[in-house]
Amino acid sequence: MRDESRIALVTGASSGIGAATARALAARGVTVGIIARRSERLAEVLEACRSHAPDSRSWVADLSDPPGAAALAEEAWETFGRLDVLVNNAGIPMRRPVTRISLEEVERVMRVNYLSPVAMTLAVLPRMIERGSGTIVNVSSLGGRLGITTEAAYSASKFALCGFSEAMAADLDGTGVKVRLVLPGAIDTEIWDQPGNDPAFYTGPLTPADEVANGIVDAIDSDHFEHYLPDMKAVVELKTADFDSFLTGMLAMAKRPEAGST
């Protein structure tokens, strides 16, 4: 896509997939609004975006407050006059066994990873429908299709986002508003070394965030609803075909001597 007339709002944009997506959109001439908690990092991303799209803006915000997230989406709409694309990307990990997580921690993960994307979507959706156009991009995870050991809270939040996106895509048929679901796999971002999380069992290669960002940009104008980045759909199909075998493999991975090593 290249269209200087488009405006996109991207959450979780101070690093990783969000920052890369904002830069990729701006490089194509799209004016971007970017949201994240870390002001200094966000300012760096904004500077890069403005070198291509000078009317881009930023908002420093904590998306663990869904009503606040909704108000922010409305503010962004008022600031720009419209939003053509909403990229719900912000997310936090919770990588510990279910025996060592609290309800409060689960609730925070759900607020950031699921409820705030829903709140922001519902805030802009009536106006998109009224205009007869718009695209909602929800960035879930491969963990939104696979229940990954030690990631019960994270997977639950991403499963929820997948279900919401699927139902919404059907609900919005004929309105001119599109829904795109993005499911990244193991991506080279800060999610792997966040405080309060156990080391990851996965120690294989990581896909660069820029590759995922380019995939998200392509997804916006795609005719397809679901986008695995990289393509890991076969793993999901294997689980669906034989869950017992999938679970056996998951347990074997968790019990490897090197599992969880860094």
Residue ranges and their predicted role:
Residues 141:
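Residue(s) in the substrate-gating loop at a strand-loop-helix junction
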Residues 14-15:
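Conserved glycine-rich cofactor-binding loop
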